[in-house]
């Protein structure tokens, strides 16, 4: 396989990942040592994320194929990309918390469900609770009226019992 064919294959791979992933976070990892990058990779892998370093020229071409040309502005300097196919919050949350601990890691941009997101949007997404947390909040809100009704009927029953005794 020629070098050109290998590069085309890599561009296709990146474009596919950009299109299919729920969430993609582009970071500048300059200043992190090997141990820190390994720790970040480990945390992302445990969450089901893929973290790779690609050449900027290939990533630019893939962004054009995936119709995400807004990404081209941030593809300067050392760039790594975290992808997740199912969870839109996981990569942003992990990278944001890691960036708070290690100031050298800088979030450049993101792609959330096919739309290019700014650094602020990625950080806002990272502050959201997980899907399970959001579902539990929704469930508690839905249960509140039923719980209050049950407590009210129990209070009425207790009051009647006291009056009858």
Curated annotation (Swiss-Prot):
Subunit structure: Part of the ribosomal stalk of the 50S ribosomal subunit. The N-terminus interacts with L11 and the large rRNA to form the base of the stalk. The C-terminus forms an elongated spine to which L12 dimers bind in a sequential fashion forming a multimeric L10(L12)X complex.
GO molecular function, one term: large ribosomal subunit rRNA binding
Family: Belongs to the universal ribosomal protein uL10 family.
The keyword RNA-binding is assigned to this record: yes
CDD domains: Ribosomal_L10
GO cellular component, one term: large ribosomal subunit
Its biological purpose: Forms part of the ribosomal stalk, playing a central role in the interaction of the ribosome with GTP-bound translation factors.
Source organism per UniProt: Halalkalibacterium halodurans (strain ATCC BAA-125 / DSM 18197 / FERM 7344 / JCM 9153 / C-125) (Bacillus halodurans)
Keywords: Ribonucleoprotein, Ribosomal protein, RNA-binding, rRNA-binding
A single BP term in Gene Ontology: translation
Name the UniProt record assigns to this protein: Large ribosomal subunit protein uL10
Pfam annotation, one family: Ribosomal_L10
Gene of this entry: rplJ
